[in-house]
Amino acid sequence: MLFLFTGCVTVREGGNTALPTSRTFHAGFERVWGVLVAEISSFAVIKTIDKTNGLITTEPLKVGAGLMSEIVLKEYAHRPSNILGTWDAGRAVLSFFANSQGSSTTVRITAHFTGFENNVTHSWMEWPTKGVLENVLLDRIAKDLEDKEYTAGIGPTVL
């Protein structure tokens, strides 16, 4: 018995798109910096911390292993156009940049995702970010800043 499978392939035009990876918080640099350090320390090993320049980088984070690597990486990044690729491992290195703008602080997160391709190149290949992880982290920072306002008694008054 012969089965014929047909289908179509959709090619993205104009390259990969990503969610925004920066956000301005209505809080001073010192407050935002403290939240950044606490938040990053909760899930990653900090490699570099430079408060003067507002920069924090992480050691590589494991993003999936074995057969699950490709599935997990696809949640956060765009798969490279490597048709025969098989992915045995994934990782991400994050950089956080905080910049004071008067009474506000802008935080920009850069995520570099890579997958280890074990069929053709046998090397680590870049997976362009979708901005998903960065947005989750920016939301966590916003929530932490909001929680600190309520703890300090500066939040909105409820009547």
Please place each PLM-identified region on the residue numbering:
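C-terminal motif of bacterial Sec signal peptides marking the signal peptidase cleavage site
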Residues: L4-G7
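Ser/Thr-rich, low-complexity intrinsically disordered terminal regions
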Residues: V9-L159
